Regions:
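A structural boundary signal for the start of the first folded domain, especially the loop/turn
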Residues: 2-170
Length: 170
């Protein structure tokens, strides 16, 4: 029995489409698996000082409204330096302190700034400051602030935790 040529052409065209479709589906599945989502970074720059407010909630601990309100609470600090709230759910470093020092260096270099970090991977909160702000927010005072607000983080109230920390930094 012989198969007509038109049938062969239809089958080979159909097979090619199926193979192409499967390859595209596999490509997009692989691509989708390699993409990591990062929370939207909210920033504000003080026009008179050039210092910034940065809110990076990578662990998605805050609502959009809480991020906005937190940024407003942080804004007065830009008189003395930049200020950041950072939350993470994965810490590739040995400790929370190592992570925050690296983040500070990458984000602010050696300029005056303070960072409040919520490290969900290590279950830790940390404040790191440098420059002019360090004259007020010393390591000792940063430890006092984190001691004061730790109870809010323990209760899962990360907004109040961060808001109160920045209120004490102000």
């Amino acid at each position: 029995m012989t198969v007509p040529d038109t049938y062969k052409k239809k089958c080979s065209s159909f097979s090619a489409k199926i193979i192409l479709g499967c390859l595209l589906a596999c490509f997009f599945l692989l691509l989708n698996g390699s993409i990591t989502c990062k929370a939207e970074t909210k920033t504000y720059t003080n026009k008179s000082t050039g210092y910034q407010v940065i809110v990076e909630d990578d662990a998605n601990l805050l609502t959009d409204e809480e991020e906005t309100a937190l940024g407003k609470e942080m804004a007065p600090i830009t008189t003395y330096g930049s200020v950041a709230f950072k939350s993470i759910d994965y810490n590739p470093y040995y400790s929370t302190e190592d992570y925050i020092r690296s983040y500070y260096r990458d984000t602010f270099g050696s300029t005056s700034a303070t960072v409040f970090l919520v490290d969900m991977d290590e279950r830790n909160i940390w404040i790191h400051s440098n420059g002019t702000i360090y004259e007020t927010i010393t390591k000792s005072y940063a430890n006092t602030i984190t001691d004061n607000v730790y109870k809010y983080a323990s209760d899962g109230d990360y907004y109040t935790c961060a808001f109160t920390a920045f209120d004490q930094i102000n």
